[in-house]
């Protein structure tokens, strides 16, 4: 099994084995090759101006027999674990006695089904999935939102604080894209010690 670093980062002198090489090694030794993508996305996030994250389709094309990923986070659905891959291995998982304890309830299946239907129209994903919409917002758009709310904040905190809009870089969060930063804007609130 290979685990994609979707919600953590390893820094320093590290290396990772290419998935195609691992898949070949597993085939040579008759071992199934599973990749856990963690946060998971079904689309190329670069199309929305976001950093690349591997998709299940890319991972299977690289030779993985099974791919696991989250139904929430980048996918935008309910909290769930999803397994895709070779049918014979999926059948073995279905026969496992633990499957009953880990299966999805009907409400989660309905919610996941509704989100998966959204992916049939990729051009509407940004407007349909709040997480992708938030991640794909341009810094200028976020700055405009800051401009709309800065006066009420300034009025509320009074003269004891200085309130201003600043440029910043935001973390994606939600167990996705560690160490990846997106250009953004923020409201900085700092105390005015001289006015106290």
For each feature predicted by the language model, list its residue ranges.
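Short, charge-rich amphipathic segments
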Residues: 32, 38-42, 74-85, 126-139, ...
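Conserved C-terminal alpha-helix-loop-beta "cap" of PLP-dependent enzymes
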Residues: 143-196
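Helix N-terminus capping/helix-initiation residues
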Residues: 18, 55, 138, 173-175, ...
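Structural motif of enzymes handling amino- and sulfur-group chemistry
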Residues: 88, 96-97, 104-155, 168-169, ...
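Conserved PLP-enzyme active-site core in the AAT-like
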Residues: 1-119, 153-154
């Amino acid at each position: 099994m290979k685990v994609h670093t979707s919600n953590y980062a390893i820094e320093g002198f590290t290396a990772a084995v290419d998935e195609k090489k691992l898949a070949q090694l597993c085939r040579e030794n008759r071992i199934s090759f599973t990749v856990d993508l963690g946060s998971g996305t079904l689309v190329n996030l670069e199309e929305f101006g976001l950093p690349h994250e591997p998709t299940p389709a890319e991972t299977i094309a690289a030779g993985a027999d099974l791919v696991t990923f989250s139904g929430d986070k980048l996918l935008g659905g309910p909290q769930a674990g999803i397994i895709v891959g070779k049918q014979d291995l999926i059948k073995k998982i279905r026969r496992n006695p633990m499957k009953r304890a880990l299966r999805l309830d009907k409400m989660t299946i309905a919610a996941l089904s509704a989100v998966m239907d959204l992916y049939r129209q990729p051009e509407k994903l940004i407007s349909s999935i709040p997480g992708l919409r938030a991640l794909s917002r341009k810094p200028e758009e976020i700055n405009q939102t800051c401009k709309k709310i800065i006066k009420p904040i300034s009025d509320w905190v009074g003269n004891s604080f200085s309130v201003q809009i600043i440029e910043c870089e935001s973390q994606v969060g939600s167990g996705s894209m560690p160490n990846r930063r997106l250009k953004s804007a923020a409201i900085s609130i700092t105390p005015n010690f001289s006015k106290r």
